[in-house]
Amino acid sequence: MKKIINPWIGLENEGYNCFACAPHNPCGLKMEFWEDGDDIVSYWTPNDNFQGWIKTLHGGIQATVMDEVGAWLIARKLQTSGMTTNFNIRYRRPIPTGENVTLEARAHLREQKKMFAIIDVTLSVKGRVCTEAELTYYCFSKEKAIEEFKFRGCNIEE
């Protein structure tokens, strides 16, 4: 597994402050990502500030984590930016919060049709799938990704 370098680091003065992945956002999730073969993975500890119910991770935060790992799949595997156009989620079991919980978010590109990518995402705790989703992303042209979204390519650490 190789760590993915955040391509937006250094763009804070141009507006980069993503709730999910900006390491400097004081309210954010501060997610980091790894490439694991064909998959993109993030390991994240959901602290108690992200509860929906007592010691239970809020469903909207789960959706955010899934959407973000899908976006990073687009960035790393397809080398562009995109936007979510469809999101179907299934909550199978609650995800606990707390310092001793490590959540694995895993995204896999199922299919690409022209400018659309269909991505399967799972959230697991201790190897047990808690939430799963199918996401559809519209993938921007490389030119638009560069010009409008400051995309400079997405690389891994050596």
Language-model-detected regions and their locations in the chain:
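Short, surface-exposed charged micro-motifs
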Residues: K30-E32, R90, R106
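Hydrophobic residues in beta-strands and at strand termini
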Residues: W44-P46, Y91, C139
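Non-catalytic linker/capping segments at the edges of enzyme domains
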Residues: M1-D48, F149, C154
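A conserved, well-ordered hydrophobic junction motif at loop->secondary-structure transitions
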Residues: V41-V65
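Hydrophobic core residues within well-ordered beta-strands of beta-rich domains
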Residues: L29, M83-T85, V101, A117, ...
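Hydrophobic beta-strand-centered segment that forms part of the acyl-chain substrate-binding groove
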Residues: V69-E104
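Beta-strand secondary-structure signal
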Residues: V41-Y43, N88, T102-E104, I118-D120, ...
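HotDog/MaoC-like acyl-thioester-processing domains
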Residues: M1-I9, I95-T97, H108-E158
